[in-house]
């Protein structure tokens, strides 16, 4: 899908809770071999939301940063879409909370999206379509989650909290969208039924037929459509469920480590689900120079991938410092014990 009109990112923002738990702390409780865990998942620690944080508060913080960089009146935002698989309410949209918090209400459309870890990129596609068609001036797309892993499950080492937001428009772009491509199938690799507190894994479906197949098909489809190859990109961002998968899929597609390593943050923050690939994207934008081309490929269980190509403009240097960089959130951390973590994540039921 190639936009018929110029469209792209006007402002972007990230947010990561300051609390962290080290892999060693989790391993000590469950008697796991921490060296095997860290080498297998390529992760050191993960973010933990405080008792007063949820995907809505994370979305609000990221949105405020995006609007600050966009330098727009929030009233000009015509659509807000929040992608998450951990909304604080079963029946009440997160998008309206964000709209009110940033002063965008009441003349706009808003909705919540759910497609596992790629709901945020689906929101970007929708906003881009509305903006390019002329139906709205600006759209705000957000991916935010407070992921859960069952006590003792390997997922507990990676399921984390964080999010990113993007103001989509046609003028004053910091990154122009060249195109987007999606690949979608019905693959039962990961799910959580209504009423279940924690998700379940699909075993043999979780690797090659899910993550790798979808990301590779989406990335190749986009590059073929745009007549681009891996060497045409300065940065490549892939969904980061752990540190091993994005590096492996990058090699499979022909990307070099220097294109990928600057965008990998999972080792320091964990898998933020809907925020995962988008946080990697903000890491690239935080250091990109005008003219740089960035590939972003999300993945959501169930299953699907959205791929994008963006070209950074000169305006990035004007607005980058108008909101906190992702690195500032990664450095601002307070470590907690497993007991504190269990309390914050409400794993203890009374």
Swiss-Prot record:
Signal peptide: none annotated. Transmembrane segments: none annotated. GO terms for biological process: farnesyl diphosphate biosynthetic process, mevalonate pathway; isopentenyl diphosphate biosynthetic process, mevalonate pathway. Pathway: Metabolic intermediate biosynthesis; (R)-mevalonate biosynthesis; (R)-mevalonate from acetyl-CoA: step 2/3. CoA binds at residues 204, 244. It catalyses: acetoacetyl-CoA + acetyl-CoA + H2O = (3S)-3-hydroxy-3-methylglutaryl-CoA + CoA + H(+). The keyword rRNA-binding does not apply. GO terms for molecular function: acetyl-CoA C-acetyltransferase activity; hydroxymethylglutaryl-CoA synthase activity. Catalyzes the condensation of acetyl-CoA with acetoacetyl-CoA to form 3-hydroxy-3-methylglutaryl-CoA (HMG-CoA). Functions in the mevalonate (MVA) pathway leading to isopentenyl diphosphate (IPP), a key precursor for the biosynthesis of isoprenoid compounds that are building blocks of archaeal membrane lipids. Interacts with acetoacetyl-CoA thiolase that catalyzes the precedent step in the pathway and with a DUF35 protein. The acetoacetyl-CoA thiolase/HMG-CoA synthase complex channels the intermediate via a fused CoA-binding site, which allows for efficient coupling of the endergonic thiolase reaction with the exergonic HMGCS reaction. This is Hydroxymethylglutaryl-CoA synthase. It comes from Methanopyrus kandleri (strain AV19 / DSM 6324 / JCM 9639 / NBRC 100938).
């Amino acid at each position: 899908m190639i936009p018929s009109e110029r469209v792209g990112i006007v402002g972007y923002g990230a947010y990561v809770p300051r609390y962290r738990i080290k892999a060693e702390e989790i391993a000590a409780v469950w008697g796991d071999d921490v060296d095997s865990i860290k080498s297998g998942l390529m992760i050191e620690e993960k973010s933990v939301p405080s008792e007063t944080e949820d995907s809505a508060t994370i979305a609000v913080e990221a949105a405020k940063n995006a609007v600050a960089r966009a330098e727009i009146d929030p009233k000009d935002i015509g659509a807000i879409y929040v992608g998450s698989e951990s909304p604080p309410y079963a029946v009440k949209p997160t998008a309206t909370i964000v709209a009110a918090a940033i002063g965008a209400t009441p003349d706009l459309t808003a909705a919540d999206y759910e497609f596992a870890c790629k709901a945020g990129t689906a929101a970007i596609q929708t906003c881009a379509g509305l903006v390019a068609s002329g139906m709205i001036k600006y759209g705000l797309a957000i991916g935010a989650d407070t992921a859960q892993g069952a006590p003792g499950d390997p997922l507990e080492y990676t399921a984390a909290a964080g999010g990113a937001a993007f103001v989509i428009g046609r003028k004053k772009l910091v990154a122009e969208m060249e195109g987007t491509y999606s690949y979608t199938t019905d693959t039962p690799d990961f799910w959580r039924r209504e009423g279940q507190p924690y998700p379940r894994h699909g075993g043999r479906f979780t690797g090659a037929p899910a993550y790798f197949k979808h990301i590779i098909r989406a990335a190749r489809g986009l590059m073929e459509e745009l007549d681009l190859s891996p060497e045409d990109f300065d940065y490549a961002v892939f969904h980061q469920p752990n540190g091993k998968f994005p590096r492996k899929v990058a090699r499979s597609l022909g990307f070099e480590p220097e294109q990928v390593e600057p965008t990998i943050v999972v080792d320091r923050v964990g898998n933020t689900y809907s925020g995962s690939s988008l946080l990697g994207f903000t890491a690239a934008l935080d250091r990109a120079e005008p003219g740089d081309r960035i590939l972003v490929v999300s993945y959501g269980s169930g299953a699907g991938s959205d791929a994008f190509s963006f070209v950074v403009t000169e305006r990035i240097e004007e607005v980058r410092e108008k909101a906190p960089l992702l690195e500032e959130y990664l450095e601002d951390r307070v470590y907690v014990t497993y007991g504190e973590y269990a309390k914050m994540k409400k794993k203890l039921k009374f």
